[in-house]
């Protein structure tokens, strides 16, 4: 399993648009084959940093997942929404693998 961390730099005056965008992914991401951990919008501290986090089995599964995202009507609509509204200033993606067990889990 690998975890994808998406870091967004968003327009702080358009946080509401980012929240709508994130809520749409709540439906699309699981439907397309990834395990959505969640989307996180600014609360305290930086008003411009947001995150999306999901798990996927492998990079090969990620490629299939991306194809499904591009074919999903709501996924495509959400992408167009972000392009039209321009509330995302920058988006970076990194894939990480777990190297320790969660606290309290046998390790």
Feature annotation, model-predicted:
Residues 40-41, 97:
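Residue-level recognition of beta-strand->loop/alpha-helix junctions
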Residues 14-15, 59:
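Residues at or immediately preceding the N-termini of alpha-helices
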Residues 20-37, 55-92:
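An amphipathic, aromatic/His-enriched active-site/gating alpha helix that lines ligand/cofactor pockets
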Residues 2-7, 18, 29, 50-53, ...:
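Short, structured motif recognition centered on aromatic/hydrophobic residues
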Residues 1, 72, 84-107:
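Intrinsic disorder/low-complexity detector
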Residues 45-48:
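Short acidic/glycine-enriched loop/turn segments that link adjacent beta-strands
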């Amino acid at each position: 399993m690998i975890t994808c961390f998406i870091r967004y730099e968003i327009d702080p005056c358009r946080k509401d648009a980012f929240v709508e965008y994130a809520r749409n992914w709540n439906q699309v991401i699981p439907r397309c084959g990834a395990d959505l951990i969640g989307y996180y919008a600014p609360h305290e501290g930086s008003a411009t940093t947001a995150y999306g986090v999901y798990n996927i089995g492998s990079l090969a599964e990620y490629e299939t997942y991306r194809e499904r995202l591009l074919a999903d009507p709501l996924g495509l609509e959400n992408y167009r929404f972000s392009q039209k509204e321009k509330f995302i200033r920058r988006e970076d993606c990194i894939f990480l693998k777990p190297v320790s067990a969660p606290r309290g889990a046998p390790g």
